[in-house]
Regions:
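A generic structural motif
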Residues: 29, 146-157
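Active-site-adjacent mobile loop/cap segments within catalytic or ligand-binding domains
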Residues: 118, 127-132, 136-140, 154-212
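Secondary-structure junction/capping motif
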Residues: 62, 68, 95-96, 153-165
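Cysteine-dependent hydrolase recognition
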Residues: 99, 150, 203
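Structural alpha-beta junctions
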Residues: 19, 142-151, 210-212
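Active-site/substrate-binding loop(s) of hydrolase catalytic cores
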Residues: 1-140, 144
């Protein structure tokens, strides 16, 4: 779960950058929601990246087993089940309370007649996944990342669900998952040395300024 703190720190740096820059043009163009910490129990009390910590600690699944929050986003009536400790996703979609809350918030706050963008930040498999246009901005900052999954949206992934359900009356939602690099990453200092936070922030701001 310590890995999660690095992602929370990057999200908080992005949030503070938005506050400090006071970019009113950007504020007029977008309503920006930042979720630094969606698996709070896993972050605080988890103990492994292949089970509790990566997954939630409690859910509506049988025996209240924790859920991989990026495998439980059901689309329509079909649901692909994952049973490993690393990717366990219950017996039906949204058995993680945290995923339910995030889903409901996004549905309530998606654009009604404009463009919704969804960027899901993860570590550390060094990939760009999802919408080609969004991924192009992160490719400029993370050229070492694998691009084989650009244009793909995974099974049970939040970005697949978002692409399906967060569109407006006029425009389809655009979604992507950014997996931070793993090369040379051994702890917090290597994340700092790799300038991951600034690279992520610069890519995100560039995307927001140039996409419509």
């Amino acid at each position: 779960s310590r890995d999660g703190y690095e992602l929370v720190d990057i999200a908080n740096q992005f949030y503070n950058k938005l506050l400090n820059d006071k970019d009113y043009d950007l504020a007029d163009k977008w309503t920006i929601y930042v979720f630094p910490e969606v698996n709070q129990d896993g972050l605080a009390n988890g103990w492994t990246n292949n089970g509790p910590g990566r997954t939630t600690l409690y859910s509506q699944a049988p025996n209240n087993k924790g859920i991989d929050m990026n495998r439980c986003w059901q689309i329509g009536d079909s649901y692909t089940r994952f049973t490993s400790n690393r990717n366990y996703n219950g017996t039906a979609g949204f058995q993680a309370y945290e995923a339910q809350a995030l889903r409901d918030f996004m549905l309530a706050n998606k654009s009604q007649n404009g463009q919704t963008l969804l960027v899901d930040l993860h570590g550390w498999t060094q990939q760009l996944i999802g919408n080609e246009e969004i991924c192009s901005y992160y490719d400029r900052q993370f050229p070492e990342n694998n691009k084989k999954s650009v244009g793909r949206y995974g099974t049970g992934y939040m970005i697949a669900w978002g692409r399906t359900y967060l569109g407006s009356t006029n425009r389809a939602a655009k979604t992507a998952l950014i997996e931070l690099p793993n090369q040379g990453v051994t702890g917090h200092q290597s994340v700092v040395n790799g300038n991951f936070a600034n690279r992520y922030i610069n890519a995100t701001l560039d995307m927001l300024k140039n996409m419509n």
